From Swiss-Prot:
The lineage of its organism: Eukaryota, Amoebozoa, Evosea, Eumycetozoa, Dictyostelia. Might act in concert and/or share functions with other members of the RHO family in the regulation of a subset of cytoskeletal rearrangements that are required for these processes. It comes from the Eukaryota. Interacts with pakB. This is Rho-related protein racF1. The gene is racF1.
Length: 193
């Protein structure tokens, strides 16, 4: 059985822990408990082969900026998460999380995950958010951000579990097929004659 280490990063309260609990227990936590550091494990089959997916949940709060990178060595894949209802968490993908991950573990595959995807189809929630002048991060913006950081973009909902399995299957695929999923930009060359 191949072991794969997946570290999950992103701002506090974007839904990282809920996503991990939803995936590993098929349940949704009833209350918010900030994470300092937690581990989960999922054994699964993909394409007829067994994998042990070690899921490392990290704290997004600034207080843990010096502690969090201690979980980065030997990481096979990172999930950088943001909430589709938080522009600030979306902006921090590049201004904080990608910089941090790329500094400590350059070249490790990244999957960008937009959490709380269920809200896209919930007109009541969208209306309440608009009343508070909160706009959803458009799906296309997620795709653009993923391209910018050379990542794959997926959206998921811990509440409905929509897209959750895809996220973690993609974690494994990005490790076992690293060159098939992320197209690196071709280097431009100049020939002088």
């Amino acid at each position: 059985m191949q072991n794969i280490k997946c570290v999950v990063v992103g701002d506090g309260a974007v839904g990282k822990t809920c996503m991990l609990i939803s995936y590993t227990t098929n349940g949704f936590p009833s209350e918010y408990i900030p994470t300092v550091f937690d581990n989960y494990c999922a054994n699964l089959m993909l394409e007829g082969k067994p994998y042990s997916l070690g899921l490392w949940d990290t704290a997004g709060q600034e207080d843990y900026d010096r502690l969090r990178p201690l979980s980065y060595p030997h990481t096979d894949v990172f999930l950088i998460c943001f909430s589709i209802i938080s522009q600030a968490s979306f902006e921090n993908v590049t201004t904080k999380w990608f910089k941090e991950v790329n500094h400590h573990a350059p070249g490790v595959p990244i999957i960008l995950v937009g959490t709380k995807q269920d809200i896209r189809n919930d007109n009541d929630s969208i209306k309440k958010l608009k009343e508070k002048n909160i706009e959803l991060v458009p799906y296309e913006k997620g795709l653009e951000k993923a391209k910018e950081i050379n990542a794959i973009y997926l959206e998921a909902s811990a509440l409905t579990q929509r897209g959750i399995k895809d996220v973690f299957d993609q974690c494994i695929r990005s490790v076992i097929y690293p060159n098939k999923l992320i197209k690196k930009p071709k280097k431009k060359s100049c020939t002088i004659m």
